[in-house]
Structures are given as structure tokens and as C-alpha cells.
């Protein structure tokens, strides 16, 4: 398989059966067929990966009726390296972005979920290191949705996200206490010594642009804020390097590191009240 794997495969490729055998631990599954596929995000929203939403149909055995078969469907997300090259692709591979996320989602998050008694992220169905591919459950089919980015989060949404973050942090600390060294696989976070200098420059330029953008708001009311952001743009690179440096003597916790609207999904009741949330991506440790 190459990048954009689903575009290279026939609908009945054996790869789809491998996904379900691994993810469902059910060897009676057969006749697996790709029924539908489409991009999971808008162009430009994920620069470190490419996401595809797809549906598989299959048959499987019935436990108490060995001569019968059930026909079922499963809805999944495939995460792959993006169609890019050069510095970005080198960073993705050298920074072990896919390895870290797969390890967290498959090896760490399920254990934390057992400790805290709630779902925190999607189940992993399959992974490959070469090429870098992660297949996980599609949370939308479980009733989870992203919030409207133009509307944002309300107070109840923020409260639930903060509760999940607290459970995630505390659970990771307790898990490390129970199983010393289990976090050693993922000690390198997103921002670290291997991050290309171009990424730091991109961050600094973004802060500077925001400062310039707010300078003329409301007849100069935010000039002081603009000045602060301009100053911060010159300091932020070194500050980030210090903040993300791992300190063996401090209390260490698994940290999501990329909490924004696309990486949090919510489930609501029939009245639209938020009931629970899940993190879509987990890949950072500080």
C-alpha cells in the first residue's frame, strides 16, 4: 500500500478482512467488502495526516448457531501520512507521530479508560508501521459530532472537556505508577529537538500576524495587545523549547497537546444537551 491507500485497493481486497480480524478478534469474519469511502476532513485541516471515512460490509458467524451467518457493517476512519514531501514528511517519520498515536490509542488509552470508567478515545482496529496507517472506529456512528467552529463551545462543553482532560492526566499518572516505564515509548512530544526549524518559524509568524491583525480593531483599542503579541512572537520559539523539555524530576503526565474543535467530539441527548465527549487524536507527552 502507498499513501492514500484506499484509492489503491479493490473493494474486496484481503486488507479489509485483515482490519476486521485484528480489530474484532473474530476469525469467522469473511466476505469483507468496501462499500463507501470519502474524505473525513476538509482540505487543509490536517497537515500531518490524511483522514478517510469508510464503511465495510461483512459476514460473520453466529455463536450459538454455527450454520448461520450474519451480515453486518462497520464504519471506520483511516489515518495515513499526508501527500507531502521534504521537511514535513521527514519530521512526521523521525518524530514517530504515527507510532506515538497508535501506541497511545491502542496500548494506553484503553487502560486509562478502565481506571476512570469512561470512554476517552476511538478504538484502534488496525495499524501498520510501513506504511504508516492507523484504522480506528468512526465515533460519528456512536452518536458523536464535532461542534460548529463558528459557534464554538458553550460552558457545558468546556466543563466536560476539562473533566476528560483531568481524567486523562490523572489516569496516565496512576497507570505509570502501576506499570513503571509504560510511558517510555512516548516521551518525545510534538514539539521537541527534532521539530524542523521551519515549524517554529511558522508558529512565530502566526503570532506576529495575529498581533498585526488586531492592531486596528475598534479604532486602536487593542494596540497594547498587538504590541504584546509582537513582542511574544520574538520570544515564543525559545519559550516553547523550554516548556516542552522533559524534566525527569517533575510530575509527568500524558498530555493531549492539541485540544481544538476538530479533535474533540460530543454526544448530546435529544434536547441537544451535551452528555459526553471523546478526544479524536492523542499523540503528545510532556
Language model segments and positions:
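Glycine-centered loop/turn positions within well-structured domains
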Residues: 262
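Helix-boundary capping/turn motifs
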Residues: 25-28, 138-139, 286
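Conserved NTP-binding catalytic cores of kinases and kinase-like/nucleotidyltransferase enzymes
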Residues: 1-132, 267-279
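Hydrophobic HxD+1 residue recognition
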Residues: 259
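ATP-dependent phospho-/nucleotidyl transfer catalytic cores
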Residues: 143-256, 265-275
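Activation of the activation-loop gatekeeper triad in protein kinase-fold domains
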Residues: 280-285
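ATP-binding pocket architecture of kinase catalytic cores
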Residues: 75-77, 82-97, 108-189
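A generic signature of intrinsically disordered, low-complexity regions enriched in glycine/proline
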Residues: 16-17, 105, 161, 183, ...
Amino acid at each position: 500500500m502507498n499513501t492514500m491507500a484506499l484509492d489503491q485497493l479493490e473493494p474486496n481486497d484481503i486488507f479489509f478482512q485483515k482490519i476486521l480480524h485484528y480489530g474484532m478478534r473474530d476469525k469467522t469474519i469473511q466476505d469483507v467488502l468496501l462499500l463507501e469511502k470519502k474524505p473525513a476532513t476538509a482540505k487543509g485541516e490536517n497537515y500531518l495526516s490524511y483522514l478517510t471515512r469508510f464503511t465495510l460490509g461483512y459476514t460473520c458467524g453466529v455463536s450459538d448457531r454455527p450454520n448461520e451467518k450474519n451480515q453486518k457493517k462497520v464504519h471506520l476512519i483511516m489515518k495515513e501520512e499526508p501527500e507531502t514531501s521534504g521537511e514535513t514528511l521527514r519530521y512526521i517519520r523521525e518524530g514517530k507521530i504515527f507510532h506515538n498515536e497508535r501506541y497511545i490509542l491502542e496500548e494506553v488509552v484503553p487502560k486509562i479508560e478502565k481506571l476512570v470508567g469512561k470512554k476517552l478515545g476511538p478504538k484502534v482496529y488496525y495499524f501498520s508501521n510501513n506504511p504508516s496507517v492507523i484504522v480506528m472506529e468512526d465515533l460519528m456512528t456512536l452518536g458523536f459530532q464535532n461542534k460548529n467552529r463558528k459557534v464554538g463551545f458553550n460552558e457545558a462543553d468546556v466543563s466536560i472537556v476539562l473533566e476528560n482532560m483531568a481524567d486523562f492526566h490523572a489516569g496516565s499518572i496512576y497507570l505509570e505508577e502501576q506499570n513503571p516505564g509504560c510511558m517510555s515509548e512516548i516521551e518525545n512530544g510534538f514539539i521537541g529537538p527534532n521539530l524542523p526549524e521551519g515549524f517554529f518559524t511558522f508558529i512565530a509568524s502566526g503570532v506576529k500576524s495575529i498581533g498585526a491583525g488586531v492592531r486596528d480593531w475598534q479604532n486602536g483599542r487593542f494596540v497594547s495587545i498587538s504590541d504584546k503579541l509582537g513582542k511574544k512572537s520574538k520570544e515564543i520559539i525559545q519559550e516553547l523549547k523550554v516548556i516542552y523539555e522533559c524534566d525527569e524530576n517533575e510530575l509527568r503526565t500524558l498530555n493531549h497537546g492539541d485540544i481544538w474543535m476538530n479533535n474533540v467530539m460530543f454526544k448530546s441527548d435529544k434536547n441537544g444537551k451535551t452528555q459526553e465527549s471523546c478526544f479524536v487524536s492523542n499523540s503528545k507527552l510532556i
